[in-house]
């Protein structure tokens, strides 16, 4: 499945139906009064969160969504039928912005949560509204009004409690695959992960906690370099970050600083987010280098790193104990 996490669409509420001019034409009522009915209300356009959807892919192929127009009024003061709401399904975690102003209109995070993004136009008035002492047979009615029309920006931000971050090839996909039932593509080269991967990790209570493996960041990610710029938004909702550092890298300290710099540059409070520092690929670290690497990372980050090997399933229980403790579980 192709992962699309941004989309631009246009929404337009239905036009209100027109009011009509009509007069009573009944037996024994030779000069009936005005009886023109009002037009129906145009359809609203509504976004609805659906937990069964994982991507905004559908909006790649259809970008204009218009509600049904209201029906015109009828004789005998009959109001025209209103257009039923046009309901558009989006994934849970979709943030909706007005494209022109950037104003956030809503944030759909729970299943079946709804947001009206364009109201339909009001129906026009029939001539029955214009009866007066001076005008007993009004010929006046009004047209229905146009519905609202707006350009919108949809942004999907994954709903995960724990985000796994780090440079490309730090072992994030291997870690999430070992911890959960997720099966991301894994290989020994940078940028294997091109989309965020979600995995559910069982808590001690038996409930599940969603972990997100965020595609690798590189220097300049917050300004658009590499893959990180498009996916940093997915860790905005997380409660906790696992910062994974490749223990077998040429310079683990430099790798640490690159990611921390990108979190700070991106903003949105990410640099203050609770974080666990984890050195992965413990098996690749020479025994004589281990203390120096741990000491350097501790001094630079102010955090004592945990040592794990995702590939060999070492140290992961201790890491999860820290995760549950940080989350208050």
Curated annotation (Swiss-Prot):
Keyword entries, A-Z: ATP-binding, Cytoplasm, GTP-binding, Hydrolase, Magnesium, Metal-binding, Nucleotide-binding
GO CC terms of this entry: cytoplasm
Single GO biological process annotation from the record: ribosome biogenesis
UniProt enzyme class: hydrolase
Annotated positions binding ATP: 166-173, 191-195, 213-216, 280-283, 309-311
Main location per the UniProt record: cytoplasm
Cofactor: Mg(2+)
Matching InterPro entries: G_OBG (IPR031167), GTP-bd (IPR006073), GTP-bd_Obg/CgtA (IPR014100), GTP1_OBG_dom (IPR006169), GTP1_OBG_dom_sf (IPR036726), OBG_GTPase (IPR045086), P-loop_NTPase (IPR027417)
Keyword ATP-binding (UniProt): yes
A GO MF term: GTPase activity
CDD domains with a match to the protein in the record: Obg
Coiled-coil intervals: none
Domain of life: Bacteria
Residue ranges crossing the lipid bilayer per the database entry: none
Localization annotation: Cytoplasm
All residue ranges annotated as the Obg domain in the record: 1-159
Pfam families associated with the record: GTP1_OBG, MMR_HSR1
Binding-site residues, Mg(2+): 173, 193
Enzyme Commission identifier(s): 3.6.5.-
OBG-type G domain mapped to chain residues: 160-328
Record's subunit section: Monomer.
Protein family membership: Belongs to the TRAFAC class OBG-HflX-like GTPase superfamily. OBG GTPase family.
Function statement: An essential GTPase which binds GTP, GDP and possibly (p)ppGpp with moderate affinity, with high nucleotide exchange rates and a fairly low GTP hydrolysis rate. Plays a role in control of the cell cycle, stress response, ribosome biogenesis and in those bacteria that undergo differentiation, in morphogenesis control.
Protein name: GTPase Obg
């Amino acid at each position: 499945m192709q992962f699309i996490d941004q989309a631009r669409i246009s929404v337009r509420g239905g036009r209100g139906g027109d009011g009509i001019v009509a007069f009573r034409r009944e037996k024994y009522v030779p000069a009936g009064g005005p009886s023109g009915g009002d037009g129906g209300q145009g359809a609203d356009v509504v976004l609805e969160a659906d937990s069964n959807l994982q991507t905004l892919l559908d909006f790649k192929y259809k970008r204009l969504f218009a509600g049904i127009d209201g029906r015109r009024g009828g004789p005998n003061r009959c109001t025209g039928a209103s257009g039923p709401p046009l309901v558009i399904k989006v994934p849970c975690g979709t943030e909706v912005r007005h494209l022109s102003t950037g104003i956030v209109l809503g944030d759909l995070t729970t299943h079946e949560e709804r947001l009206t993004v364009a109201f339909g136009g009001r129906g026009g008035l029939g001539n029955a509204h214009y009866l007066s002492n001076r005008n007993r047979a009004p010929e006046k009615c009004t047209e229905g009004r146009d519905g609202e029309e707006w350009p919108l920006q949809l942004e999907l931000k994954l709903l995960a409690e724990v985000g796994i971050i780090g440079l490309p090839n730090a072992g994030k996909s291997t870690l999430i695959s070992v911890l959960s039932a997720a099966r991301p593509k894994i290989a020994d080269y940078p940028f294997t992960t091109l989309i965020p991967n979600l995995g559910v990790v069982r808590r001690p209570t038996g409930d599940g906690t969603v972990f997100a493996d965020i595609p690798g960041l590189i220097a300049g990610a917050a300004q658009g370099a590499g893959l990180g710029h498009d996916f940093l938004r997915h860790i905005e909702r997380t409660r906790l970050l696992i910062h994974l550092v490749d223990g077998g890298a040429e310079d683990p300290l430099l790798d640490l600083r690159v990611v921390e710099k990108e979190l700070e540059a991106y903003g949105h409070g990410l640099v203050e987010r609770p974080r666990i520092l984890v050195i992965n690929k413990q098996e690749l670290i020479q025994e004589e280098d281990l203390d120096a690497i741990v000491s350097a990372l501790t001094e630079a980050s102010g955090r004592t790193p945990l040592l794990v090997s995702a590939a060999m399933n070492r140290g992961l229980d201790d890491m999860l104990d820290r995760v549950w403790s940080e989350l208050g579980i």
